[in-house]
Amino acid sequence: MSLVESPPWQALKSKYQELSSLHMRDFFAQDKKRGTRLSLEAAGLYFDYSKNRVDEKTIDLLCESANACNLPLRIEQLFSGKLTNESGEMVGFHTALRQVNNFSFKTNNNAIQEIHASWEKIKKLSIRIREGDYKGFTNKSITDIVNIGIGGSSLGPQMAYNALKPYVKAPLRCHFISNLDDTDFYETVRTLNPETTLFIITSKTFTTKETLENARRATEWLMQAAKKENLIQTHFMAVTAAPEKAHEFGIQKDNIFMLWPWVGGRFSVWSAAGLSLAIAIGWEEFFEFLRGAHAMDTHFRQAEFNKNMPILLALLSIWYINFFHAKTQAIIPYSQRLVYLPDYLTQLHMESLGKSVQLDGSAVHWQTGAVVWGDLGTNSQHSFHQLFLQGTMVIPVDFIAVLKNSRESHWQLPLIANCLGQSQTLMEGYDKEGVMRDLINQGIEHEKAEKLATYRLIRGNNPSNTIILEELNPYSLGSLLALYEHKVYVQSVIWNINPFNQWGVERGKHLAKDILQALQAETDQSSFDSSTERLINYVLKIKGNRP
């Protein structure tokens, strides 16, 4: 039986018909304790989902749908290393990277032992650099770490580093290079000293075009200063699942850190792919980062579905995507330190859930995934919240608020007020009675107020979740990221798709090689469609190779 034919799914269709014409204002008016009932705390996070177009029966039916998809079994497979891809290879075992309590996994002991060894290696390097004992080619201590990678090899470490900057030990600084455009590289290193700069090359296969090209640029940049190749070897580390290729590139074997094939790039920040972060904040704080994620792992495995934060977050997304036909979801963090979180979550969601084939190879017959995007509040209030408030689409929003940036900082009350004000407005709207009352109180005549009111109405009934971190620290950040990882995994289980591959992106890379040959050597263009052929000819014309 397919997902859409299951009894809970059919019941959800009827529930949608019942609720689609109701307004959330009425839910709150009828239930004064709704905000209390539809909220929970876990792993250092507070989650309010009361401003959603659901009642308790909806939640029950969504949970039944999850059970019908064997979610309990699939959760245990995630934590036991029993998930495999279409080739039978283990995937999705990133949860092992943050198993910090007695290492109690029942299977894959070899993997756990390798993880422990990796931890020790990361810890030792972090201590050496932070204490100034790791030297460059002129015997100066390292001050700048440059992470070269792309996708998950860059987005995760950069996001986490920026979020945890108060924990970075001066004078250490981290920088991140990902783009094939050489501007990214040269603008990053422009103010750096080659004598005190360490490059970390992160690539699972060590064949990624963008990463290797930037690694080559790094080699040339260092050689201009050091003059001799043997002198720059201490300035390179590699994180990869292909150590032999990293060694062929010129990385010393002792400077190569393991990244296992069963860890996807977008789930790799917990591994040595987070080496730059571990160096910057120190091993103890990095371990707190892992502990926070593990706390959310434990909650995810143990809590009942209707009290389970990742599962509820996923089921609500399913509700809006598959029944309200929402095409997009927004993530709005109210903390400057979380500026890169929307980009990170965009990749996590869209690369994992952008699939149209089920696990058995058959076509999907229901919507999967959505466009996930966002920006910082309050900046976003002055750019695109207008679409949320007075547009015509259903756009679920996740608001993420931080009460205090650190133990020493002040409460972020103005930010919190804006965050809560946005969520309340999205829910209740601004009806004509309220608009007229406010306009008349401003001294505007009734007739003019009537005309103005039409343009100021806000229908409301737009869903949102609010997630609150008491403090933004390594533990709470780890918990927050694991929350969204598990949310995405639950969605993939219900849609019966594989969240651990991304074959779609490979085709464009392959075609880029052919097009580059045409641009460089004027090879036969008959294999290209007429549009691509015309674009190639235009580039060649401007370049001066064609009349």
Curated annotation (Swiss-Prot):
UniProt-listed Enzyme Commission number(s): 5.3.1.9
Reaction(s) catalysed (UniProt annotation): alpha-D-glucose 6-phosphate = beta-D-fructose 6-phosphate
Pathway(s) annotated for this protein in UniProt: Carbohydrate biosynthesis; gluconeogenesis; Carbohydrate degradation; glycolysis; D-glyceraldehyde 3-phosphate and glycerone phosphate from D-glucose: step 2/4
Keyword entries, A-Z: Cytoplasm, Gluconeogenesis, Glycolysis, Isomerase
S-S bridge residues: none
Biological process, per Gene Ontology: gluconeogenesis; glucose 6-phosphate metabolic process; glycolytic process
Principal localisation: cytoplasm
Name the UniProt record assigns to this protein: Glucose-6-phosphate isomerase
Organism: Coxiella burnetii (strain Dugway 5J108-111)
